[in-house]
Amino acid sequence: MSDGTNKRILFPLAPEYVGYADQGLSNDMFVAIKPDIEILNTFNGSKQFKYVIDFDAVENVLANDTSISALCVSRPTNPTGNVITDDEVRHLDALAHKYNIPLIIDNAYGDPFPGCIYTDANLTWNSNIILCMSLSKLGLPGLRTGIVVANNEIIKAIGRVNGSMVLSPNAIGPSLVTRLINEGELLPLCKNTVLPFYKNKAEIAINLFDEIFADLPVYLHKLEGAFFMWLWFKDSKIASEMLYQKLKEQDVYIIPGHNFF
């Protein structure tokens, strides 16, 4: 900041998107809080769990760390496929208002597009929320087009930053999405093509998990959205990095989870 202080962003629910790590202006720009774990009772006996926000820990950080300048959460989450509940969103929003900081919601996989959510979840917005969306999860990552819904002050600030950093903005993405919206094609595309495709893949993955790991102490994070499977090897005797190396020797590729915390 202009006064020499460093501001930081709080992730109230880890694991979180590892790509954020390279976006900070300083090495300690991000603070993350580990989740509570809720073991789920599934109707078919599938061993699943869900990460939930530890709100006591979140408020403790907000109350004692004046460097926190924003809350940030992805919904659905890369890498777990977690979709925080409507109640969790409301609670985060209330905390953001209480401590006079914005709530950033990374909505790259969410509604209304690409709409890759497989559970009940409502999209919410107010002037204290910064809602971010992307065309990349529609299969158009090369267009490098993002959409930010925020109050006028935030949008003007982003415009000034882009004016300084982006000398030749990409016009293809905005033009394409404008046409899709104006002609009423975008939402049907998401509902009738994108969502069924990925939901079917998720159901296949869950069935394979149940078959392969039925007798092992392995749990699957409930697939509520996005494109990922997150496995918890409960009581594992080795670290995730070592598991990654051992599986790679067998031509099986995973991503070790410790980097996302």
Regions found by a protein language model. Give the residues of each.
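Conserved core of the PLP fold type I
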Residues: 1-98, 104-126, 130
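Conserved core segment of the aminotransferase class I/II
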Residues: 5-12, 25, 35, 39-42, ...
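Short beta-strand segments
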Residues: 12-14, 72-75, 104-107, 133, ...
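Helix C-cap/helix->beta junction micro-motif
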Residues: 98-99, 250
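Surface-exposed helix-capping loop/turn segments at secondary-structure junctions
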Residues: 188, 209-220
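Conserved glycine-rich beta-strand-loop-beta hairpin in the small C-terminal domain of fold type I
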Residues: 192-206, 218-233
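Conserved C-terminal alpha-helix-loop-beta "cap" of PLP-dependent enzymes
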Residues: 217, 230-261
